[in-house]
Amino acid sequence: MPQNLLTLFLTAKEVEGCSPKTIAYYESTLQHMTKALAKPYTRISSDDLREYLNRYENERHAGKVTIDNIRRIMSSFFAWLEDEDYIVKSPVRRIHRVKTAVMAKEVLSDENLETLRDRCGTLRDLAIVDILASTGMRVGELVGLNIADVNLQERECLVTGKGNKQRPV
């Protein structure tokens, strides 16, 4: 069995097109799991992983979304180990998705939006508020806009979002 299966997995994710931030998150999550369980991947059971998730949640007061993210990363890793024939069956198969509440995002009222617009000190700030309010794009997406991404005639922007995916707004 290869010395560092985690490195091979991360390389596979890189080839699949995962972003450097995603790969770093996978790496830190799986390194923590590996250190905590202190046993070869071939010997890790579903019970080991459940205990790990439970301990992680309790010790770190982690939320359900965080725990499900960890479970999802473990699932991806162990599915890869199974696909590559390093293990017979993924121990994550029997660990179900963690139910999480979907929280509705708070929307600015028309009155609050007007107050925000009135307090803009420059045309630049006003343009930022207006484009965010009218398109629903993320702040990070707005920051990443270039002049070439804006088509004033069509009143459209080409936005690069999460995962380097582009979409018109």
Q: Predicted segment positions?
A:
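Short, basic/aromatic-rich helical patch in the C-terminal catalytic core of site-specific tyrosine
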Residues: M74, I128, L142
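Conserved tyrosine-mediated DNA breakage-rejoining catalytic core shared by Y-recombinases
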Residues: T135, G144-V169
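N-terminal core-binding DNA-recognition domain of tyrosine recombinases/integrases
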Residues: Q3, T7-A104
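Acidic/polar active-site rim loop that often engages polyanionic ligands
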Residues: H96-V98, S109-D110, V159-T160
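Short aromatic/basic micro-patch
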Residues: R43, V107, P168
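Alpha-helix N-cap/N′ positions at the starts of helices
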Residues: N4-L5, D48, L108-E111, L123-R124
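Basic, Lys/Arg- and aromatic-enriched nucleic-acid-binding interface segment
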Residues: I87, V102, D110-V139, G163-Q166
